[in-house]
């Protein structure tokens, strides 16, 4: 019996050792595969470094987290749609728009075209709308005047207050026979008890949630959110900018406490680029393709004769994350007179800090305007840690009383 017991113990130890070596081998292989993928595919060196450290410290756990959260599958789906449906021609047959620009602006225009893959289009009208008191009435009026289609995308769409008015107005448009499609990011809709998703569905409106992580197949996209704010009416009248459909932007009884952000009312050929962006987001959410008949029907839409050059530049989970950074740094480098940035959250990376400092050193007046009291104190503390890096080169930083405003402005002439 003692020999049998000893043999059994030896067998168990060997089995345990074999299992341990198997787990170790799997962890090593997973770590090598994860590290290789991160090095090859991560564009941001800081992101790649963080993932490498995570895999080195916790091989299996780090690899599993990378598999779930480190691979951008939304990008792959969008690329498949772009390959199947190449960019459509704009609303009119337009030639090159940047021919008569000064050299430094022509260079910026070429940069924008290269990184965005979209044409710089003439003939647009862009009307700035400051705050909800200006933007929301114009948006609601456009919805009331819709004859054929409404496409609305918002990261936050509250169902109370101003959001309830939007829901009612959209429902009235649908009752008139207007085709209405609404896209809301799933994250806020799931975290908030006041989202508009349920109310929109009760009115029979076609509404989709972007990238719901509760679906097992989309668990990997928990961190991939859609922050776009788009309203496109009848295919030719658009609104876009920084405002969600959110109560903090609408405080008629206490306007001084309202978030002050910028929205644009846009008409002209560039609305076609806004349409393509919504089409891709809608396809990613519902796998439904929107054709030209959805936007304008048989009658088509008018093309305005505005005087603004415009280009739609996308930034989101299905796009290259460096795109807006390249445009932003290119605009700072093209500035000749003044750069003014108004932002609630000033957390620049090192290339942006270098561009701002270089602009100030070559004589451009650089102003950063931030809120005196941020709605996110921790972000404000982190922001202040960067101030010295640009102040020492002559950049001016002003703290004002507003709560929330995003408005970069570049003066070149």
Please provide the spans of the model-predicted regions.
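Helical hairpin unit composed of two closely spaced alpha helices linked by a short loop
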Residues: 345-364
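Short, contiguous acidic/charged loop-to-helix segments that flank catalytic cores in large enzymes
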Residues: 319, 344-347, 373-381, 397, ...
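N-terminal localization/anchoring segments of enzymes in phospholipid and broader phosphate metabolism
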Residues: 5-326, 330, 334, 358, ...
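Structured cytosolic domains appended to multi-pass membrane proteins
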Residues: 352, 358-359, 374-375, 379, ...
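Structured, soluble regulatory/oligomerization domains located on the cytosolic or IMS-facing side
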Residues: 150, 336-339, 365
